[in-house]
């Protein structure tokens, strides 16, 4: 069932700004939101995107018995403190949810309004599940461009996380359908991403920034990090500011 945003109520938490902004856009045939069994989904170019924090992949990531993933290692370092983290690029919300499961408090930004609504719906569903409720409640989600937020907020954070979303390379292996849509819908251009790191440094919003990059990519904004955590296909550039 295709629906207009004016008829959409994601558990009574949609704001009027989003409603007015997207009422027409959600009616496009190649890109629209729809409800299926009370779950909000995105149809885009004959593909479907649905975000669920109760799926097996997420549950495995947040299992205390699972080895800490790279993003957790990069952001926590040797600290055992519970951090306030600004996630500037929410995407599918997996890193955000993983960090919140570690006890950290997240303010998460997503500029794409489709992804924002999918994430909001997913968080609200997680809040209804006993073993996920506490995690979901540590996450605050805002629909805004990251550069705009950083330049206008008076808040500060223990760490800022940046995961620039670039279109996949033509030679890269096929990725999951959800990631394919994310690459097409949620990526920023290189100038915006470079400006983001520059603005983080300029505003002194945090003493630490962590930037996720493809393993062989150049430094964001040509700025050499203080340290790095490398994996097989990507790395985390860590900036002490």
From Swiss-Prot:
Gene3D superfamilies, sorted? Vaccinia Virus protein VP39 (3.40.50.150)
Write down a Pfam family by its short name.
SAM_MT
Key word Transmembrane helix present in the record? no
What GO cellular-component annotations does this UniProt entry give? cytoplasm
Query: Where is it chiefly localized?
Result: cytoplasm
Intracellular or extracellular location(s)? Cytoplasm
Q: Which GO terms describe its molecular function?
A: rRNA (guanine-N2-)-methyltransferase activity
Q: Which family does it belong to?
A: Belongs to the methyltransferase superfamily. RsmJ family.
Q: What is the name of the protein in this document?
A: Ribosomal RNA small subunit methyltransferase J
Species source reads: Francisella tularensis subsp. holarctica (strain LVS)
Its gene name is: rsmJ
């Amino acid at each position: 069932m295709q629906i207009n945003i004016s008829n959409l109520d994601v558990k009574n938490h949609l704001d009027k700004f989003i409603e007015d902004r997207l009422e027409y856009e959600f009616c496009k045939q190649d890109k629209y939101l729809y409800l299926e069994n009370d779950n909000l989904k995105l149809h885009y170019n004959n593909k479907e995107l649905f975000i669920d924090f109760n799926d097996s992949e997420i549950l495995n990531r947040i299992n205390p018995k699972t080895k800490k993933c790279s993003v957790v290692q990069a952001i926590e370092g040797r600290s055992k403190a519970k951090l306030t983290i600004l996630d500037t690029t929410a995407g599918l919300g997996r890193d955000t949810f993983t960090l919140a499961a570690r006890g950290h408090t997240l303010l998460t930004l997503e500029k794409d309004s489709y992804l924002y609504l999918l994430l909001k719906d997913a968080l609200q569903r997680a809040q209804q599940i006993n073993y996920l409720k506490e995690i979901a409640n540590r996450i605050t989600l805002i629909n805004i461009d990251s550069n705009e937020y950083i330049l206008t907020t008076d808040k500060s954070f223990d760490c800022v996380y940046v995961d620039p979303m670039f279109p996949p390379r033509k030679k890269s292996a096929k990725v999951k359908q959800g990631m394919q849509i994310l690459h097409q819908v949620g990526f920023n251009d290189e100038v915006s991403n470079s400006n983001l790191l520059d603005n983080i440094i300029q505003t002194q919003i945090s003493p630490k920034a962590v930037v996720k990059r493809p393993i062989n990519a150049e430094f964001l904004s040509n700025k050499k990090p203080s340290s790095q955590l490398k994996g097989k296909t990507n790395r985390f550039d860590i900036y002490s500011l």
